[in-house]
């Protein structure tokens, strides 16, 4: 598969056009997760890193289009008690801010919303390219990306992103 990468020419922090080539990982797998296909069908890409001479920040200098990077759910935040504990603690932190409505960016399964709503039942919307709602999740899901094309017409007073 021939994928056209997007070249980053500016530092993501200060927008200086001073990225200097640092290193490259050849033939790096695009998808992070379990698959049902043979390894020969994996999508591989050269992962290239650069460093900003001004800020010292190391960052990807070649980017994948979002629809390739997030072509399917990778299960982050779903497996294991450590993730469940993370969502419960993050929900407690959010509650201290007393939001009335939340937009969650990338909440694939909705577990954070479910755990929060056990304490306070509020409007919760999740923007996710590959929604896979867990049991007992009643959040509203919007299939999509948080990019320059995204427009949210609802009312929110908090935006969260859990990982």
Predicted regions and their residues:
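N-terminal juxtadomain amphipathic helix
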Residues: 1-82
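Glycine-rich loops and low-complexity Gly/Arg-rich segments
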Residues: 45-47, 76-77, 85, 129, ...
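A gly/proline- and charged-residue-enriched helix-loop-helix capping module
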Residues: 82-89, 93
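Conserved SAM-binding loop
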Residues: 91-163
């Amino acid at each position: 598969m021939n994928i056209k990468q997007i070249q980053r020419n500016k530092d993501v922090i200060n927008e200086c056009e001073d990225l200097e080539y640092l290193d490259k990982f050849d033939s790096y797998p695009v998808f992070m997760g379990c698959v049902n296909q043979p390894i020969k069908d994996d999508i591989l890409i050269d992962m290239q890193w650069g460093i900003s001479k001004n800020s010292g920040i190391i960052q990807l200098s070649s980017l994948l289009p979002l629809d390739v990077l997030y072509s399917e759910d990778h299960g982050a935040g779903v497996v294991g008690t450590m993730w469940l504990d993370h969502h419960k603690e993050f929900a407690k932190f959010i509650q201290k801010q007393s939001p009335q409505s939340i937009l969650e960016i990338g909440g694939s399964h909705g577990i954070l919303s479910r755990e929060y709503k056990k304490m306070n039942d509020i409007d919760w919307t999740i923007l996710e390219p590959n929604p896979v709602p867990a049991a007992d999740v009643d959040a509203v899901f919007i299939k999509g990306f948080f990019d320059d094309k995204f427009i949210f017409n609802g009312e929110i007073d908090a935006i969260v992103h859990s990982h």
